[in-house]
């Protein structure tokens, strides 16, 4: 009996050990992951509200759920379940606390329109605070808690509405779009008051500390490229003519009053309007005057928040722009002092931070951070000690999955310039003579990049799912190299300008030097190479397979194959002028840098993926490249995703896109998972 008990115990221990082994990561695992899309600390600093986005395959949408957690730690609790968080195309709640902390505002659906809802923290039913016919795109409580300011489009003219109903409506391309207005409304009722003229398209705003004035940024037209044509104004909540605060060319946006009301901080390209211009941080007197640039380096500012003493500003740099070279894969929260512009990191380590907010006394700072191989969690930082506390674990199942090792790598390019990248290797792989099939993943942009995290390119795009399932590829035995060539983030503004009139030149050579380095180091098998990427990464993928036959498989998504297409057909066409001038001014260069010109050289089996309604990278380019390759007997397949834009937003399509990419590289490269499971070095 005793022997039987011992045998049973040993069997149970062995079984537990088997079940405890981490299992491989799959595409379906990627579709179960949750993302934190918004974080906001309460004014008293004692609670943090956040929203989690979850893919719902049954409904084919990404759903948002609101939670509240104590800043000192503990269990999160669900809030506001009666409010359906705005999720077109993805959850975008824009959490905002009232100044007394009694109400939590967010954007949710009222019918099919996004409106501002207030959720009482002391109990009671949620209620809609706005009833805009066109919905609300942004809002802010007034500091005194009496009013709400928000953005909404002008309503559709009655005649246009009639024409749309009877199918007689015609789109007049030169007709101005309806303006986005800044509106103010008292919380206790009353008629909303429009504060801005129909000639302005407002994109951001903030309240003055005394609740009497609103500062806002606006362009004279709408559209994607209008972000580089913004000015800053202020207007009284009682109405009247707007006052010009910053009047210069380029981007001037995200105005934020200092707590003492004397200054306005804003993001600016300092008089330049091309896409490569550094988005720095400036301050200007609240009533107008000469502005002053605080950051003299190449940091691109994303979000900002004043310290409560008005002496410094916290900000988040866009990925790879504040810390260059080996730190380019980080996105730390940074603090800059207004008096002399000195700046330093607030959050140390390999961290990628977003959605920062401060308590009313400035002692606590809440944010979303991606640390290690995660999708991000909620953290609270003690401003005095610099100690950060993790409050959530939104994807605990990651602890049961075998994840690859992600590390930064460096190599020398053709001109001896150091180029950096990230290298993902399979779980348990050790550099012991076993070469791996290598997939090169090209980032978008051109000014984009990679950061640390589970989906290295899309950690900065809230709840966006990567079309290339790098972690599932690692589990299938692939290594994935994510190069950061010049032209993208990490090398300053000069690095971005290095590819002007030269796409596919130095950037291509930087990438290929990385491939050669991985082969020379015994990591990559030179006979099992693949390449993939979307947007500019799609362009680079298409370009690579026209320049070399070294790759056995390629997948190009949302790609630019004929460079005249984005100028003539894209919503961002003017940005092509920044790189190549206009097509009739530089015809030879447009052709010389277009993959379509060299379609006859392609020998690599190519998968082309494109959203049917892509306005950024027109689908015409996918069709042209496909037809050119097909007519010449090349191995090519074209997948078109109905309703899809420049990226896909429907979970069913996202899953299929990932499956197709994994199946394509597996088919042509025929990877096998590593046989050994020795510890990674």
What spans do the regions from the language model cover?
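Short loop/turn segments that connect beta-strands within beta-propeller blades
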Residues: 70-74, 120-124, 186-190, 236-240, ...
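Beta-strand-rich domains and repeat architectures in extracellular enzymes and scaffolds
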Residues: 28-64
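Residue-level detector of Asp-centered blade-edge/turn motifs that repeat once per structural unit
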Residues: 43-44, 99-100, 143-144, 209-210, ...
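A short beta-strand motif characteristic of beta-propeller blades
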Residues: 27-31, 77-80, 127-130, 192-196, ...
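Hydrophobic beta-strand positions that form the internal "hydrophobic ladder"
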Residues: 48, 101-104, 145-148, 214, ...
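A flexible loop/linker signature enriched in serine peptidases of the S9 family
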Residues: 52-65, 81-92, 105-117, 131-137, ...
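Serine-hydrolase catalytic core recognition
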Residues: 310, 352-681
């Amino acid at each position: 009996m005793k022997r039987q008990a011992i045998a049973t115990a040993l069997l149970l221990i062995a079984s537990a050990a088997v079940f405890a082994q981490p299992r491989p990561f799959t595409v379906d695992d990627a579709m179960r992951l949750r993302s934190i899309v918004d974080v906001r600390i309460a004014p008293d600093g004692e609670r943090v509200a956040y929203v989690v986005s979850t893919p719902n395959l049954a409904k084919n949408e990404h759903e948002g759920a609101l939670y509240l957690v104590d800043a000192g730690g503990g269990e999160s609790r669900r809030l506001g379940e009666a409010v359906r968080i705005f999720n077109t195309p993805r959850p975008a709640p824009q959490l905002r606390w009232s100044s007394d902390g009694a109400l939590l505002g967010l954007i949710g659906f009222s019918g099919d329109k996004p409106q501002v809802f207030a959720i009482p923290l002391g109990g009671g039913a949620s209620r809609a605070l706005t009833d805009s016919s066109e919905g609300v795109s942004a809002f802010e409580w007034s500091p005194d808690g009496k009013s709400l300011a928000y953005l909404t489009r002008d309503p559709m003219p009655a005649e246009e509405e009639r024409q749309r109903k009877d199918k007689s409506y015609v789109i007049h391309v030169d007709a101005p779009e309806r303006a986005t207005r800044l509106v103010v409304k008292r919380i206790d009722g009353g008629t909303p008051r429009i504060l801005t003229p129909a000639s302005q398209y407002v994109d951001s705003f903030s309240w003055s500390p005394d609740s009497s004035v609103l500062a806002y940024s606006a362009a004279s037209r709408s559209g994607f490229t209008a972000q580089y044509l913004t000015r800053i104004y202020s207007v009284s909540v009682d109405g009247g003519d707007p006052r010009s605060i910053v009047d210069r060319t380029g981007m001037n946006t995200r105005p934020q009053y200092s707590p003492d009301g004397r200054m306005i901080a804003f993001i600016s390209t300092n008089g330049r309007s091309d896409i490569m211009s550094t988005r720095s941080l400036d301050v200007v007197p609240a009533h107008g005057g000469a502005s002053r640039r605080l950051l003299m380096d190449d940091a691109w500012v994303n979000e900002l928040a004043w310290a409560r003493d008005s002496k410094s500003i916290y900000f988040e740099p866009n990925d790879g722009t504040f810390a260059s070279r080996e730190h380019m894969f980080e996105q730390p929260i940074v603090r800059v002092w207004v008096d002399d512009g000195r700046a330093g990191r607030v959050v140390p380590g390999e961290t990628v931070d977003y959605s920062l907010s401060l308590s009313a006394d400035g002692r606590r700072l809440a944010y979303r951070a991606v640390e290690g191989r995660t999708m991000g969690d909620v953290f609270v930082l003690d401003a005095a000690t610099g100690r950060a506390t993790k409050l959530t674990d939104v994807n605990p199942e990651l602890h049961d999955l075998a994840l690859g090792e992600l590390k930064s790598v460096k190599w020398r390019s053709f001109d001896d310039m150091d180029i950096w990248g990230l290298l993902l290797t399979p779980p348990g792989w050790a550099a012991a003579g076993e070469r791996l099939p290598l997939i090169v993943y090209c980032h978008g942009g051109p000014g984009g990049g990679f950061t640390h995290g589970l989906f290295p390119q899309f950690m900065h795009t809230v709840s966006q799912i990567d079309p290339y399932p790098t972690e599932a590829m690692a589990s299938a035995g692939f290594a994935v190299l994510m190069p950061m060539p010049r032209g993208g983030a990490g090398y300053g503004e000069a690095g971005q300008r290095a590819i002007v009139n030269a796409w596919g030149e130095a950037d291509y050579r930087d990438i290929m030097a990385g491939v050669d380095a991985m082969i020379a180091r015994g990591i990559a098998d030179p006979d099992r190479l693949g390449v993939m990427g979307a947007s500019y990464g799609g362009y680079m993928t298409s370009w690579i397979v026209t320049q070399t036959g070294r790759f056995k498989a390629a997948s190009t998504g949302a790609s630019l194959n004929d460079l005249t297409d984005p100028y003539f057909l894209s919503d961002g066409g003017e940005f092509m002028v920044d790189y190549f001038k206009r097509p009739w001014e530089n015809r030879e260069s447009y052709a010389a840098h277009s993959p379509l010109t060299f379609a006859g050289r392609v020998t690599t089996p190519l998968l082309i993926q494109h959203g049917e309604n892509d306005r950024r990278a027109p689908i015409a380019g996918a069709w042209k490249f496909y037809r050119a390759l097909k007519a010449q007997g090349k191995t090519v397949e074209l997948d078109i995703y109905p309703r899809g834009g420049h990226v896909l937003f429907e979970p069913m399509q996202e899953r299929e896109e990932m499956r197709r990419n994994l199946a394509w590289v597996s088919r042509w490269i025929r990877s096998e998972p590593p046989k050994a499971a020795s510890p990674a070095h």
